[in-house]
């Protein structure tokens, strides 16, 4: 056929651990002033217990795509809201980090199959204008040999707290590179 459209919506609201600045009494924003998010999951010290479930985190968005047998093209939008304003002390090393109470990320993705080749990629932009992109190709050259190449470029000011794209570091920011891979299965017993 001519293809079809697919739509997916998502939403989440939960309490998360965060360091609250209790000394900030002059803040004019709604909600507490947050100095950082806690990601360890530990609640064994007094400070960690104070940080437990300190603020509400809300995520919402959707993805729409057009799909045919060989082509998929989509767009994604995601919006995040935090129950307080993140007000980190910005230093040289973190000057481009997210420092607000909400963020929107928009993106477009594609995948094209042609014979034994799969070309794919995604481009994304955060609310502050930071961009991230990756593009790749997988090739099945033979039943025993496959080849892959992936280019990635995550700008220093890209802000997406939940992204988990292919990267060297744990965050998808300030990184550019190319990955090349070869998979070989010389015999049918090769794992």
PLM segments and residue spans:
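Hydrophobic or amphipathic alpha-helical targeting/insertion segments
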Residues: 1-2
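Residues lining hydrophobic/aromatic ligand-binding pockets adjacent to catalytic sites
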Residues: 94
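Outer-envelope exported proteins of Gram-negative bacteria
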Residues: 8-12
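Exposed, low-structure sequence patches enriched in small/polar residues
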Residues: 57, 62-88, 97-191
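Outer-membrane beta-barrel and related beta-rich outer-membrane complex signature
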Residues: 18-28, 85-89, 161-163
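A subset of solvent-exposed loop/turn segments in beta-rich extracellular surface proteins, enriched
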Residues: 17-50, 98-103
């Amino acid at each position: 056929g001519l293809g079809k459209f697919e739509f997916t919506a998502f939403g989440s609201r939960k309490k998360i651990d965060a360091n609250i600045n209790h000394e900030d009494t002059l803040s004019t924003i709604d909600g507490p002033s947050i100095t950082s998010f806690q990601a360890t999951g530990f609640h064994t010290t007094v400070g960690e217990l104070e940080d437990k479930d300190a603020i509400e985190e809300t995520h919402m968005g959707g993805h729409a795509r057009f799909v045919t047998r060989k082509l998929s093209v989509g767009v994604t939008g995601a919006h995040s809201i935090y129950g307080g304003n993140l007000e980190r002390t910005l230093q040289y090393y973190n000057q481009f980090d997210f420092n607000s109470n909400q963020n929107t990320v928009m993106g477009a993705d594609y995948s094209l199959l042609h014979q034994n080749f799969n070309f794919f990629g995604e481009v994304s932009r955060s609310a502050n204008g930071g961009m991230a992109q990756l593009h790749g190709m997988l090739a099945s050259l033979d039943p025993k040999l496959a080849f892959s190449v992936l280019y990635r470029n995550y700008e220093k000011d890209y802000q997406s707290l939940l992204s988990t794209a292919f990267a060297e570091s744990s965050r998808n920011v300030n990184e550019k590179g190319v990955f090349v891979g070869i998979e070989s299965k010389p015999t049918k017993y090769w794992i």
